[in-house]
Amino acid sequence: NPHMNLNDPDTALGMLDYFNRVQYGDWPTVYGAAYTAHIADDGIETEPNGNYKTKITGKNYIKDRQLKKYVWVSDKRAYEYGKNHVQFMPKMFSNDPNVMENYAAMYGFPEFELNTAFFNNLSDPPEIRAQKRQIAEQQYNELLQKKHDGSIKISDLQRNSELLIIHPPTLAQQLNYFIDFQLGYMGFRYFMWNFSGRQNDWEGNMEVTRGNWITGIPIIDNARLGDQSKLPAKFKDNKANNKYYMLPLILGLIGFFVQLNRNVVHWWAILSLFLLTSVGVLFYTSVKPFEPRERDYALVSSFYAYAIWVGLGVQGIYLLLKYLLKNKINTKAAIAIPVICLGVPILMGFQNWDDHDRSKRRGAYALAYNYLSNLDQNAILFVYGDNDTYPLWGLQETELFRDDVKIVNYTLLGAPWNIEQVLRKTYNAEALPSKLEYKDYQLSTNDNIMVVARNIRSRFSEIQSIISSELSLSEVMSLPPNEISQHLADPGYDPMGVLEFYNEIKPFEEFYNKESMTVQEAYEFLMNNDNPAKQAIARHFGYPLGSVNFLPVDKLILPVNKENAIKHGIVSAKDADQMEDYITINISRQQLYKPELLMISMFAEYEWDRPIYFSGGGISDPGNIFWLNDYLENNGFTYKLIPIKTPFGKDGKLGRSNPEKMYENFQNLEWANYHKDNASFSNTDRNYTNTYRNIASRLAQDLIELGEHQKAKEVLDKVMEMIPDQPRYDYGLGLDRISQLYQTLGETEKAEKLINSTRDRLVEKINFYESLPLHLRYTVASELASARSDYSIMVYGQVSTLLEKSDTAEAMKVFAAEFDPVKQKFIETYQTATMNGEPDSNDKNIIDGQINFISELLGIADMIDTVYAEKQTEEIYNLLINN
């Protein structure tokens, strides 16, 4: 009875879906639509009514459990793309907004021109055509200017697609993307990791600092990636910094040519395996910029194939020496060759051991333990990604730890097989409360729930606006047609047309003024397709009930059973008077899907007799927590649903604080061996250190507000002991906040130590990034901006803490100490760059960035002394003017 049975392959259909990996979707490989089809006005063919054209690509079947056979439920459909955007080698195909922006930024923005048909419609009056032309040309010129200065985005084209003719990427652009990014960055880079060397294990998005291949030979690496000896410690002192000096690569090349020369049949076999499992896999998968994680594992078979040539390279060296020595090689030399070559795998073993040693890596275990150990009995926990799901399931499976907790991965709830699994008991965890039956969420049923509250209000407001009468809308519409015209605002309106429109929308008039439903009422409305109002809504909006459903309100009311909430420990008795009678759920989307259907069904049955938690990994999107963001209590790694309102983000905090409970939880945290220097951690593990620090700083802040200064100090000392201030854990807002809290507690020495190490690392980063030539600095532009921003945050933290104590003089002193080196560096850079006239593009890029950095810092100075800030601004301005 496992937590998840992927695709439920107990049936033939489930097995087929499992093998076809249907959860990953499909994409074109040799011929199909480019990504511009999703932004151009002619990208997808349309029907006369304006809907997108689709074509049948197959049939959807399900297993009918009553009939005990497979039955057809719907057709599989795909868009019919415009012929201008269908092409050979559509390697740039994704319609993901972020991916499309990356396509354009990296491999060329799509060409576009003004669509004159937009303003040349002869059926429009001349004045309308002139007005349209003026608007179109103005927008077009603005887009051209944006393209010229490099600030244009794909979203700009999408907003103005009606005005433009957008051209797809050229074949040259598609091939460039395939060769440079897919084969080069996502293929050759991984190959070289294994046979040349690896810079570090930070996930790379084409930056020169993260996850590149290296050789260990400075003259080669520095030319490609900048001076590696000056790389910031975060990247340089990484346990995955492995240098093989290209020795495995060279051995493999020797073996490649030896086999080609001696046994071409076997050579072809290995070459075929190598190409199919490298180039073939990359061609088929069409990886996108950028993937959620490194995809080197997809090419592992090709590495095995090349390793065969590495082994044959030893034989090649023997044969080469034998040839050079004219077959006079002796036994000792013959033995020495493999012994010497054995040094290559030994070198790799020594280089790889520290980052492959998992003996002290307890990040996943600690994360799972910390999530589960602090939850109340019989809890429901919603999680969102692989990293906050599988470790938890793993701990429940292997140790039966907290197997009373029902863990639900929210992002998988769109799949019927997954909904079915969360609606059953798992080990000692009860199923989610819900009356949903399989027929309610099966394939092609309730795939899309349209929230039409705004549309309904718009329809009735529209017809209301043409009524000019003291009578109500329904009273006017009940009159004979010849009398209706007397109550219309414009005599030109056709009373029969108005009446016909009203009669069409009249069945759902009750929802015009009805803003909300209880979740129980909403669930019943969704489940009842015989409801006349819903049938009228479906007819009006032109969608058949079945795969599409409708919700006529955008506010749901969740009643609170206060007695149960206290009885089951969701709220403590001392907080009983703060509980609300009901929770209002404000739905901000106009389309809901199966995950939201499940949530509605669950809350329709919810009696506040089980605690509900949400993982911290999902709360950034209110929809992920069903818009319950104002009713959360911070629990550290999770947030608990409580019927006490705490506005989301109040005082810069997410969720209500419960310091007493949090302090108890904090004492029992697992720390994953982060404090051990010889422990190796993955990129994901290291990123979670910020979560621990944020939890500690939030708790310490709450304790300080309660006057519990000693406890706050203990919390801060504990987190700094267990997650030391080391480059591998990097700087984050949590660390900045800890230094501020130390200052607040009077622990000046500890605060200054943190600030000094933070400053040193940020300056190290900024200096390295600015030392790179422009073409390399471009790859780390966001990291440079982030380092400067972190520096500003560090300064702001120091200044704001002192200003809270009304110590303006010390705040000014601290600011000047941080600002003056930045200012001096800018002056030196600017004077050097302009010594012989105008700065070149490389220097201009650095100068522009430094000016923005200084402006950001002077914004902080303005908090302390506006006169000082103005004086510094004027000094910088005069420097620019006089040169």
What are these language model-derived features?
Residues 1-299, 306-378, 390-883:
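ER/secretory pathway lumenal C-terminal domains and tails of membrane proteins involved
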